[in-house]
């Protein structure tokens, strides 16, 4: 039997809310009118949706329409309920309406428009200060959703929209997000491979908000070391091997022992033995301008096997790495 675990913060948030806050299965969707929106151009497609830039013809305002592919009603309700609960939260994409296509009966979510520089293109070009600035903005969104009893479960560059001109960040795609209830066992088939925490890879289901902090750590590592992605596994098994090559196998086994987790036998042949590496060994001439002792200390406190050892979003914001941001000593516009 694996041993239980609970979040260090915001543990009982949902227990103190009315059931209708988190009971999305009984949620009744308030469908708006699709005729108010005209699609302008396709922005992209995901596993579960197609995304378009659109215009609200009654207000002439730009917006973004996410047309959902056929998926369980329950999953759609969960995404809508979470977006409604988080509406108005710091740096959380704003859901404006939910409509149904009259012909296909396909649901579509209408969002505020964000100038679409996705982080991925941008974040290999950012300065040290800008990396700190945007990660701080992302942490505001994570602390907000965690404080509201919600785990995002798919934090990655692709789901972070940045309007670089206006220094505006939005955390998007809440399709995998879920309500946190201590003691609940969750599906480990969430997040994108390169950003999956060790708990998912070893099939530990009683995870919590700290999963998002691992994913944030992976983003930080890829940004400061200019290595995208930082842990580049070819499949979910290889993903854990890539992590173990950096964090060490002894440390992995200590984590498994602590929670009494049985490793899938497939790992025995591929894991081998790896010593823990110092973060300094990833520093080279092309990335040294982005690396500082406080950046490495911050990274070290995020990329921990044991989810309870990772910084929370609130603790992360208090880390010295963000002092230049908190003090606002510099203006990002005049940073080289």
UniProtKB/Swiss-Prot annotation:
Top-level enzyme category: transferase
Residue positions of the active site: 154
Reaction it catalyzes: L-seryl-[protein] + ATP = O-phospho-L-seryl-[protein] + ADP + H(+); L-threonyl-[protein] + ATP = O-phospho-L-threonyl-[protein] + ADP + H(+)
GO biological process terms held by the UniProt record: aggressive behavior; chaeta development; circadian rhythm; compound eye development; DNA damage response; intracellular mRNA localization involved in pattern specification process; lateral inhibition; locomotor rhythm
Required cofactor names: Mg(2+)
Protein kinase domain segment(s): 37-322
Residues annotated for ATP binding in this entry: 43-51, 66
Full protein name: Casein kinase II subunit alpha
Gene that this sequence comes from: CkIIalpha
